[in-house]
């Protein structure tokens, strides 16, 4: 029992590091960029404390440096710091660009997840409304009484027979067929500045092609966010 770790999650490890090294780590607010190679410094400084393992430290560092508040702190002119808060050199431009790309992709994933969740909610609400049973007739309400004296109904002219009209296709089906889009199978046919769609669940978002790369297409959403999307998520 003595060898069991006291800190069971990466969040608990981050809270411990923020308390142990307050000039380097923070539990809330904007985070400071960390020194390159700080993992080895952590192993040497906290080895044996709280029964922390290298795996726990590595997982906590990965979670800390991928958080939005840390990525916001990686900007031009910022200084990296060591465990004691001492500056260890200014951030390079390539590191700043990489952090911005990670932040934009994370925001785009959250936006796509929200759009998919909203689509599922609307679909579930439609199914629930369609399955709702009709309300029963209120108790005590009787059908309309027949005419007194059993009088025969007035002679009425038979209605002229009308030709059956062909069933009209529902408007929703027509709109759906009109809005059906073609998936992108060859990204080499795309052009810079071309308007396309980015599929997110059952909905699609407007986007503009910024760059065609080997691993996908870099696009800019209508919200201003830029991200790299694989071909199977693109539509004309």
Swiss-Prot record:
Q: What keywords does the record list, in alphabetical order?
A: Chaperone, Cytoplasm, RNA-binding
Organism superkingdom:
Bacteria
NCBIfam families in alphabetical order: PRK04950.1 (NF003434)
Q: Which Pfam families match?
A: ProQ, ProQ_C
**Segments of this protein annotated with the region Disordered:** 105-185
Q: What gene name is given for the protein in this entry?
A: proQ
Similarity comment text for this entry: Belongs to the ProQ family.
Q: Which GO terms describe its molecular function?
A: RNA strand annealing activity; RNA strand-exchange activity
**Does the entry feature the keyword Magnesium, yes or no?**
no
> A Gene Ontology biological process annotation?
post-transcriptional regulation of gene expression
Q: Main role? A: RNA chaperone with significant RNA binding, RNA strand exchange and RNA duplexing activities. May regulate ProP activity through an RNA-based, post-transcriptional mechanism.
Q: What is the protein name given in its UniProt record?
A: RNA chaperone ProQ
Q: Which SMART domains match?
A: ProQ (SM00945)
Source organism (scientific name): Serratia proteamaculans (strain 568)
Q: Which residues form a coiled coil?
A: none
Q: Where is the composition biased (Basic and acidic residues)?
A: 145-157, 169-179
Q: Where in the cell is it found?
A: Cytoplasm
